[in-house]
Each structure stands twice: as structure tokens, then as C-alpha cells.
Amino acid sequence: MATKFPSFSQGLAQDPTTRRIWYGIATAHDFESHDGMTEERLYQKLFSTHFGHLAIIGLWVSGNLFHIAWQGNFEQWVADPLHVRPIAHAIWDPHFGQGAIDAFTQAGASSPVNIAYSGLYHWFYTIGMTTNAELYQGSIFMMILSAWALFAGWLHLQPKFRPSLAWFKNAESRLNHHLAVLFGFSSIAWTGHLVHVAIPESRGQHVGWDNFLSVMPHPAGLGPFFTGNWGVYAQNPDSMNQVFGSTEGSGTAILTFLGGFHPQTEALWLTDIAHHHLAIGCLFVIAGHMYRTNFGIGHSIKEILETHNPPKGTPGDLGAGHKGLYDTINNSLHFQLGLALASLGVVTSLVAQHMYAMPSYAFIAKDYTTSAALYTHHQYIAIALMCGAFAHGAIFFIRDYDPEANKDNVLARMLEHKEAIISHLSWVSLFLGFHTLGLYVHNDVVVAFGTPEKQILVEPVFAQFVQAASGKAIYGFDVLLSNAGGAAANANAAYMDGWMGAINGNTDVFLPIGPGDFLVHHAIALGLHTTTLILVKGALDARGSKLMPDKKDFGYSFPCDGPGRGGTCDISAWDAFYLAVFWALNTVGWLTFYWHWKHLAIWSGNVAQFNESSTYLMGWFRDYLWLNSSQLINGYNPFGSNNLAVWSWMFLFGHLVWATGFMFLISWRGYWQELIETIVWAHQRSPIANMMGWRDKPVALSIVQARVVGLAHFSVGYVLTYAAFLIASTSGKFG
């Protein structure tokens, strides 16, 4: 007899109800909980999944390259990136009539296609690709890489090739390898690609597999490198009137510090980018020699942490300091994952900021829809990663934290001071919430009663001061970099011309701000602090609280501990994650609304609309949401359809998915159990239907599972709705 799913849990496999299926899916990746799991086996399985992950990423990249080469218009776009719309892929089956077929036959295509808003065209062009053949080659290369990664994943599950537990626990060697080899070498290798391929292509000099060994990236060759005369590589940069992709105005420099943007492409100078990657690569290679391994040189992280104690009598004494942290972190995969997710979350948010403020890809700043899509995409990913970081932090406290091993160290002190931490976050959230909402509501009321001059408008003077210190002249502060003859400006003379031109020019670096920005900044701060409050409380209370001191014994996710201890519902660490996701989505909504509306106003040359309407609530509802929905909603109507029709449909569908979430969030398990029992009864008493039997007795989802289904619908619907709105409202205006 075939083994029932799930094979990793005999207890679940023998469950006679449909709980077997849903719990099996829910715990499939919780390797720690599987039957017969050892610590070594756990690490080995996780190690192999990393190769699977890499294979999926490689396959995805390969698919993008392949479809753009096959069905896109890359070569036409390269010839005129400002006027040709990039094609993502063909639409094979537009079965909605001739009107729609005509509407989606766009961007010079002869059949229906989708427009690309991914920025991939800009990236491929910037890094030196100009032909479909090169895209195909890249696609095949990534396919081979994926196959290799899959093989590596399989290989490391074979008995002979499974790394030992000691190998996984060797933190210093792993850090050195990741820093020097993965980060360091790959950064230097990327510099090599930019210098040898991308920069020559940007100057009209083709470099490919046919000639890369014979084309010198710099006329002086390697001579200056070996003689230490490195300044030669920065001489003769591209001129301010260089035409990207041609010899016109091109220089010979390969590593520069120009600052600012290429006037035609409005992207960072490629030679500046190459310099950046070389510098950061060298730093990482040095960092990768920092930790002591079997060579006996460098630092021992454990020694550093053990001795990291403040002198006795220091105010705010840290107790045992960082004692015990090395083993605590090194023995907890959840702690490590929490740190990794938090770091990646911050980096992803920074990527969102930098991709629009300091774009590195040629002409991407002129593709408004792509800029908006990429900003929004990266901020949404950032909130997901940050919520995950705290979730795994909480799991660490429940499964991995050892109070004895961490006696009186900084981790134990966090737990001891949790009341102070949580109550301060609560106070900040309340303060921000009441004051910000109070200002918005006041302004809304006075505008509604026809006296807009009675609004309370606060200039963000401190933020304006920071912008002025960075060189923005519009406010007249005359401080630091905006003080032309000052010491700060002189000290940074190397890149000052380019930077000052950028910050005071028509770019996205430090946009002018006013009272509307001040208010929405504090609304976003409210969202961030409230999300943080929920997440931090969930992690710090994960082991127990005054209400439920034995909470850790119930695990990460539990619905309640029955009616006998009234009030134990909704307090598991999982519930904190669940509640935080709603606030995180709320926050990223305000953040992306702000970014998008401010940019729509700038791009359309009507900054007054944002400045005047963003100071009261109805301004946001009417002049941002309602006004920008109109084109979208008319994507299809009784009179026909246009090329926004697909986004109109997605907008409606997103609302449907989102609203479905409430069905699971509002009704509890008993309702569904009764409904299921009634449906089973009806099946059993109906002809034909009664021929069908259930191998598993149908039962309702658990409370926690129903919540996760509700949360998934809410989140996915939220994302689909806003994505459709964002893309349609931007592309409908700017094409």
C-alpha cells in the first residue's frame, strides 16, 4: 500500500480527516518538526534547497531573456529607447474579439503583445547587450547554470557528498568565503564586465565573444596598474554631450569619480559605477580575511564577543555584555535567518530609493511607468522580508533560546526590559497617530467648509536643512555643500560639479518638500512604528507574558488555550506576525501612494496639484485615487476596449480576491464546520453525488489556517489591485 502523504510525519499520515492534507502542506518546509530529523540532516537538507533556489532564479532569468529575444523588440528599442515601447512578450490567445486584438497590437508589433515595465530592457542595454543573439546566448547560459545548480543540490544529498555538521558550524570560514569570494570576487568580476564590455559598448565599440581578447579596454593597457600610476584610468572621461552607444563625445577613462548623471541617459556614469564595484570588491576581499580559521590568523568572533564588555560602573551597565551570543547565533538557524531577512529587507528598501533617485540604467528615468513599478515592487518586497525577520526572531525565542547560556547578556536584557521597549513603541505610535490624523482631519474640515487658509501647514525645516547640507540651493540655507565657497564644498571638489548639477537639476535626487510631504512622512512613520510595535511585542512576548507565562510550551502558532484561561486567544507569536502584515501593507500603501502621486505631479509638470491637495484627506481620495482611477476603469466598457483593459480587469479581480479574504477573517471555524457537515449530508442523499466518497473525513480548517488563508487573500488582492492601478494610471498618462 502506498504511503499516505505526508511521508515526513507518521502521526499526520494516519489522521483520518482532511486535516492530514492541510497540516501536511503547512509543515512541509518545517524540517525541524519532521520524523527522525537530526541536526546534521536538517543542515544538509537546507543546504541542498539553496541550490534548488538558485536553479529557480536562473530559470526565471533565462525565461525573461528568452521571451524578450523571441517575442520582444529589443533591437528596435536599442535604436530609439526614448520612443519605442519595450515588449515583454506576445499574447497568444486574445479571445476577446477584434477590438481587443487591435488594442493590444501595439509598440510596432504585428500581433497582440504586453508592454514591459520590468526595466530589463534598460538593464540589458546598459550592461552591453545590443542584439537578440546576445539575449539568446544569455538565456542558454542561464539554463546551463540552472541545470548545474540542480545537479549540485542533488549531489549534496548523496551520502558521499553530504557536508558534516562541523562544516556547517564553522562560521568564520563561511563568513570569509561569503565576504571574499561571493561578494568580493563577484564585485571585481562585475567591474571586469563593465570595463571590458559595457563601457566600450556605451562608446560604440562592440565587444563580444568574437573579439573580447583583442579589444583593449583602455589604450594604456595594464602598464599604469603595475606602475601604480592608477590616475591614468580616470583621465579623459566621456564628455557632457556624449551620445550613449556611439563614439560621439566619448572618452577613454574606465574608472572615474565624476558624480551626477549622464545628461542624455539621466543615469549614473558607467565609469563611476565600475569604480564603485572595484572599490567595494577590494573592501570585501580584505574583509574576507578578517576571521580566524585553520590558518590561525585574524579575529575569533567568539573572543571578540566574549570580551565585548563595558568597563565596570558604566551607566546603563550591559551586564554580561555579549557573552554566549556566538554559540546562541551559531546554533540557531532561526536567529541567522532573522538577521539575514532584516538585513535584506533594509537593503531592498534602499534599492527602491536608489533606483529612482540615482538610477544606474540608461534611459530608465524617462520610463515613468517602469520607475513607478520598480519602486513599488521593491518596497513591497522589503515589508515582506522585514515581517519574516521578526517571525523567525520569535521562533528563535520559542525553539532555540537557552536562558542559561545567555544569562544576563544583552539578549537576556532585551527580554528583561521588554515592558519598557513595548510601552515606548506604543507611546510613539499613539503620539504619531493622534497628531498626524488630527492635522489631516483639521485640514480636511476647514477645506470642506471653504476656508482652506485655516489649514495647519508645517514646513519640514529640519529635512530641508538636511537637503541644503547635501547641496540643495532652493531653500536658501547656505549651509555645508550648498555654501559654495565653504570648507565642505571644497573638500568634496572631486565630484562636486556633477553632484551639484544633479541635486539642483531636473532629477529625482532630494525632491523639494513642503507641508504635504511633512504630513505624509509622519503618516508613514506612524505605520512603521505600529508595525514595529506589533512585531517586536510578538517576538519579546513569544516565550511568555504575565498573562500566559508558559506560552513557549504551546509553540509558535496556537489559537487559544481553551476557555479555562479566558483571554489566551490571539497572543501567539504567529498572531503578532499575522496582525503586523496588515499594518505593513497599510504602511507600504501610504508610502507608495506618496511616491507615486508626487512623481505624477512632477512628470506632468503640475507640482502644485500634489502640494495643494496632499495636506487634507479628501485631496488624497479625490485628486490621487479617484482622479487616477478614471482612465483605468474605462479600459473596457459597452463601447469597446483599449490597451488598459487588462489592467481594468486585474483591478476588479484584485478587489475580488481582497474582499474574499474577509470571508475567512471574519467568520470562525464553527461556521465552516457546520457548513461542511451540511454539504456532506446533501451529497450523501443526492443521486450521482452519493457515488462519490471521501477517503478523508472533511473537516474545517483550523483557526490559524483559516487566518492564513484570509491573510493570503487580503495581501494578494491588495497587491494585485494597487499594481493594476499604478501601471494603468501611469502608462495611461505617459504611454
Swiss-Prot record:
Cellular compartment(s): Cellular thylakoid membrane
Please name the source species.
Synechococcus sp. (strain CC9902)
| Subunit description | The PsaA/B heterodimer binds the P700 chlorophyll special pair and subsequent electron acceptors. PSI consists of a core antenna complex that captures photons, and an electron transfer chain that converts photonic excitation into a charge separation. The cyanobacterial PSI reaction center is composed of one copy each of PsaA,B,C,D,E,F,I,J,K,L,M and X, and forms trimeric complexes.
This entry's comment on the bound cofactor is: PSI electron transfer chain: 5 chlorophyll a, 1 chlorophyll a', 2 phylloquinones and 3 4Fe-4S clusters. PSI core antenna: 90 chlorophyll a, 22 carotenoids, 3 phospholipids and 1 galactolipid. P700 is a chlorophyll a/chlorophyll a' dimer, A0 is one or more chlorophyll a, A1 is one or both phylloquinones and FX is a shared 4Fe-4S iron-sulfur center.
Q: Does the keyword Zinc-finger apply?
A: no
Query: Under which main EC class is this enzyme filed?
Result: oxidoreductase
Q: Where does [4Fe-4S] cluster bind?
A: 560, 569
Q: Report the Gene3D superfamilies cross-referenced here.
A: Photosystem I PsaA/PsaB
Q: What is this protein called?
A: Photosystem I P700 chlorophyll a apoprotein A2
Question: What's this chain's function?
Answer: PsaA and PsaB bind P700, the primary electron donor of photosystem I (PSI), as well as the electron acceptors A0, A1 and FX. PSI is a plastocyanin/cytochrome c6-ferredoxin oxidoreductase, converting photonic excitation into a charge separation, which transfers an electron from the donor P700 chlorophyll pair to the spectroscopically characterized acceptors A0, A1, FX, FA and FB in turn. Oxidized P700 is reduced on the lumenal side of the thylakoid membrane by plastocyanin or cytochrome c6.
Annotated membrane topology: Multi-pass membrane protein
Question: Ribosomal protein as a keyword?
Answer: no
Transmembrane annotation, as ranges = 46-69, 135-158, 175-199, 273-291, 333-356, 372-398, 420-442, 518-536, 576-597, 644-666, 708-728
